[in-house]
């Protein structure tokens, strides 16, 4: 399974140019105050994540923001379904740098142990709330699956 990070602009370009990759599931982060990208013409495996791009600097802030990330368990199930179906995953957010990078890092760390490399890549600033919530949900899902 390949995990890609993509911005809204690049994703919209792929849809317009009809260059959307086959066997691909999408995790689409968007600000709740905006409309999400419509993937219905190019992809049926999409998980929409309405979540503000807020980073945190303390454990208290993390707990406060994690309450808003109430879809982590469903997202973990979606990710495992894509993994089991041998699909690639595109993690997309507005700029392709924070929420999508945090999600991609969690997926790569969980399945391959390579997600922390995204934290050292200057192209990304992974959202820690997204990373920890997705990673923890994937671990819990794997435990339940056994």
Residues covered by each model-derived region:
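Helix-loop module immediately N-terminal to the HCX5R catalytic loop
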Residues: 47-90
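Hydrophobic, Leu/Ile/Phe/Ala-enriched alpha-helical segments that form helix-helix packing faces
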Residues: 15, 75, 79-82, 134, ...
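Glycine-rich, flexible N-terminal cofactor/catalytic loop recognition
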Residues: 1-49
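Adenosine ribonucleotide-centric catalytic and binding domains
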Residues: 41-52, 115, 126-130
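Short, amphipathic alpha-helical segments
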Residues: 69, 98-101, 124-128
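Cysteine-dependent PTP/DSP-like catalytic domain, specifically the C-terminal lobe
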Residues: 105, 113-146
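Catalytic cysteine-centered active loop of the rhodanese-like fold, especially the PTP/DSP P-loop
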Residues: 81-111
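Short catalytic/ligand-binding loop motif for oxyanion handling, primarily in non-cytosolic enzymes
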Residues: 35-37, 57, 98-102
